[in-house]
Regions:
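Short glycine-rich, low-complexity segments
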Residues: 1-64, 70-207
Length: 207
C-alpha cells in the first residue's frame, strides 16, 4: 500500500468534509439571518438603491409608484416616481404590499451595513410634529370610515400631533392656514393614515 496516496486521499476527504460543514453552517446562519429580517430592514435596503420605482399598495386602497429615499423608525420618505417634487411620508404599518423587480427583491434581503443614524430613530409622529411646528400644508390620505375600499384625501395644516392621532385644520391645498379659510377640523388616528404628502419647497422633514 502506498502510504503517500493514503494520506493524500485522507486529506482530500477531510478537506471535503470541512468544506461541507462550513457550507452547512453558512447556510444555516443565512437562514437565521433572513428569518430575523423585518419589513423596515427590507425597505432600508431599497432606499436610494432600487433599480426602478417601487409600487406601494397602501391602506387607502391605492397603489403609489415611488422611489424610497430614506427610512425612519416606522415610516419611509418617498418621492412620487412621476413627480419627485411631491414627497410622500408613509407609515410602514400602512403598507399592504410592495411590488418590486426581482433584482430589487434580492437586493433588499442582503445584509445591511450597521448604521445608527439619528434619522433612523425618528418616528412617524415626530416627523409630523415637525411639519406641524413649521405650519406646512399637507395632503393626507385616509381610508373612509364605513365604506370598504373607499378613501379620501384631506388637505390642510396639521395643528398638533398626539401619541396616536393628529389634528388637521382643513383648507384648500397650497393655501396658508388662515382662520377664515379653515373649512373644519378632523382628529385622525395615525393608524388610519395611509400617507402624508408634502410638496417641494414646503419643508418636508429632513431624513
Amino acid at each position: 500500500m502506498r502510504w503517500e496516496r493514503f494520506f493524500d486521499d485522507l486529506e482530500d476527504q477531510l478537506a471535503a468534509e470541512w468544506e461541507a460543514e462550513r457550507a452547512a453552517l453558512e447556510s444555516e446562519a443565512e437562514r437565521l439571518r433572513v428569518a430575523r429580517l423585518d419589513l423596515r430592514s427590507r425597505l432600508a435596503g431599497l432606499a436610494g438603491e432600487a433599480e426602478g420605482p417601487v409600487a406601494l399598495e397602501l391602506l387607502d386602497g391605492f397603489v403609489r409608484d415611488v422611489r424610497i429615499s430614506a427610512v425612519g423608525a416606522d415610516w419611509i420618505a418617498a418621492p412620487e416616481a412621476a413627480d419627485a417634487r411631491r414627497m410622500l411620508l408613509v407609515p410602514i404599518g400602512a403598507i399592504r404590499g410592495i411590488q418590486v423587480g426581482h433584482g430589487d427583491l434580492l437586493r433588499s434581503a442582503r445584509p445591511a451595513e450597521t448604521r445608527d443614524r439619528l434619522a433612523e430613530r425618528v418616528t412617524f409622529a415626530l416627523a409630523l410634529r415637525d411639519l406641524s411646528r413649521r405650519r406646512v400644508g399637507v395632503a393626507v390620505g385616509v381610508a373612509a370610515a364605513g365604506e370598504a375600499g373607499a378613501a379620501r384625501t384631506l388637505t390642510g395644516t396639521i395643528d398638533r400631533v398626539g401619541a396616536d392621532h393628529l389634528d388637521l385644520a382643513m383648507h384648500d391645498a397650497g393655501a396658508p392656514r388662515r382662520a377664515a379659510d379653515v373649512r373644519g377640523y378632523r382628529m385622525l388616528p395615525l393608524a388610519g393614515v395611509a400617507w402624508v404628502r408634502v410638496d417641494a419647497g414646503a419643508g418636508a422633514p429632513v431624513v
